[in-house]
């Protein structure tokens, strides 16, 4: 049985409530006048728990999902649905997830990036939106029910987490270098690879291409630490990528750039390009 918040607001009274009783063995209807429609009906929203992803996400997460009034057909014709707020807004949005209410059907549509563009402050990303919409159900007689449907809407792991940019590296022929992976959560917490996630070679074969050029690349699946050993007889730029695969199946690409120099080069004090790469 769905448990949801419901508040009865008495407004204009214009209909009758009919009770059944028995008199001398016969069923008799007794009408009580001036009972609001809000006392006769109870809108019942379906419970919703979901995770939303980007439209470019290949993990099968939906970009948008609807939450409906399960007993909508039982409500009187002319019933309207509005947000329980002091404004005339038809949607609740924080720049990431938009929850839009249909005034005719009561359907709430939760959409990732539903405002057209995604905007947020780093370190202030919401992971889960719980019971975020409160609906004012307005009946034809102007009486009102206030309902807060139960919903838990989460954003994908690949949106909530981000990999800290990795500086380009300079390394001599035959030398090895270890590059750790740092992951930043949506709340600003800095740590390692999230529990349940793993780091693997990218699906496009860029690591294998680098190895064909003589490099040796080892990736720690749990920590994301990458060990790069430069080829003995080749110099120049070597680029490749790894993938951080999250528990929900979404992923982030992590890019690496190495400048391999000859052993005879003595001055390694100048960083290559002096820039960093975004993951």
Swiss-Prot record:
<keyword id="KW-0732">Signal</keyword>
<protein>
    <recommendedName>
        <fullName>Uncharacterized protein Cgl1822/cg2042</fullName>
    </recommendedName>
</protein>
<feature type="signal peptide">
    <location>
        <begin position="1"/>
        <end position="31"/>
    </location>
</feature>
